[in-house]
Amino acid sequence: MMKPKRLLSLLLRLIAVGATLAAVIIMATSHEKGTFFAVSYEAKYTDTPAFKYFVIANAIVTVYGFLVLFHPPGSPLWRLVLALDLVFTMLLISSISAALAVAQVGKNGNSRAGWLPVCGQVTKYCNQVTGALVAGLIALITYIILLLHSIYTFLNPLLEKA
Amino acid sequence: MMKPKRLLSLLLRLIAVGATLAAVIIMATSHEKGTFFAVSYEAKYTDTPAFKYFVIANAIVTVYGFLVLFHPPGSPLWRLVLALDLVFTMLLISSISAALAVAQVGKNGNSRAGWLPVCGQVTKYCNQVTGALVAGLIALITYIILLLHSIYTFLNPLLEKA
């Protein structure tokens, strides 16, 4: 039988892998043909560097999360996993912030810079980007919980002995 | 006499406070009158939510960094400082990523979305935003070094005892 703590941690890691994978798939499949000033164009995530960064970062975190699932419990490498969790949480924060900032311009535009909002023309594309960002946020929250849990279980026995 | 380690940590914290303060001042004072399609306008950081977030985040981290400077060494609260360092490093990463993503659109535009680059019209403004981002990056690197240093000095005695 698995310990409840280990089971909870495994469940959280499964959710995290699912969420980052969903973020990659939803963002990568987002495209829609729109018309802008009578010019037809196709909105794709590759048009926006911030969205490309989001896909790459989430793909990296998915691969990492998947590999950690098969990591045996009680291995001395868990200290490394704690450090890597931290690094990949920072990568997620960075990619979500960047994608969110550009998505905000896409939704509301920036009148001072003369950037018009595009979500009116490509509603489906915008909804998909929003979905990907929500999936990314779920992954981020899961990783932060995992991080707090790891720090607690890792530090607690050390603190008791100290 | 201060210990060399403590002196180094204090020096790093001074650099971090200076860098975040510089980021706030440079970004907050950035404004330039430009002409866009014969319409005169003034580019300011308040036009862009991501830049406002950058200024607020850096201001918060400046205040925190300043307060920590006066924190007595050997206090039991240093464990809290380590946790807060982590939180504020994440805040810095997030704000810099968001500002960088929008600054990239400002510099290169996004032809698919019909967003024209604005740096040709407001070069001085763009240079100041770039300066603020560089200051923010310096602060971020300093905080990451501080974090690694804190984790090392905090965990080392515990690991030896364990």
Swiss-Prot record, chains A, B:
Which subcellular locations apply to this protein? Cell membrane
Enumerate the Pfam families for this protein. Answer: CASP_dom
**Gene Ontology terms: cellular component:** plasma membrane
Give the principal location in a single coarse category: membrane
Which ranges of this chain reside in the Extracellular compartment per its record?
28-49, 101-130
Q: Which residues lie on this side of the membrane: Cytoplasmic?
A: 1-6, 71-79, 152-162
Where, by residue number, does the polypeptide cross the bilayer?
A: 7-27, 50-70, 80-100, 131-151
Q: Which domain of life is it from?
A: Eukaryota
Q: Which family does it belong to?
A: Belongs to the Casparian strip membrane proteins (CASP) family.
Q: What is the protein name stated in its UniProt record? A: CASP-like protein 1C2
